[in-house]
Amino acid sequence: MKKITLLIILLLSAVCHAQMKSGKDVFDTARYGTVAEMKQLEAKDKNIINSVSPMGFTPLILACYRGNTEVAEYLAKHVKDINYKSDNGTALAAAAVKGDINMAKVLLENKADPNIADPLGVTPLVYAVQFENTELIKLLLEYKASKTYKDKEGRTPLDHADFTKNQEVINLLKN
């Protein structure tokens, strides 16, 4: 019995070591890898960058949430659906939540739709308003984010702005 237990432990150790040596999967690479690593994965499987994790995230969404700018920029230019919607929204929503104006611009330049809401009906513009990120609000409005879209509670971006009491944010939405 001891020999079998020892054999199982050695086998599991070898498997774990092999997995560690083999590198990161596409989702780990999206979070904290490099463009070169992403290209290596893509060379093995062209569609891997369009994968969806068990939690419902694409590599692009994960790269945006983690602030892995170079990988996110690469993915934004190469994925099939830049507007893929997870249970937590799109890659653009992730950039808005993170307050990453540069990433939002890259996504918008690559045809990200600023009017796709998450399951709660919240759009990237509403996130930008809630975080009082005036530069991001301006950018989203430049790319035709809807000022009149209502979330599931019937509130518009201006309603959210009124709650912040930030006059600059309110004025951006009134003009």
What annotation goes with each model-predicted range?
Residues 4, 17-44, 54-57, 61, ...:
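Intrinsically disordered, low-complexity regulatory segments in ankyrin-centric signaling systems
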Residues 10-17:
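Hydrophobic h-region of N-terminal signal peptides that target proteins for export
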Residues 52, 84-85, 117, 150:
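Ankyrin-repeat boundary/linker signal
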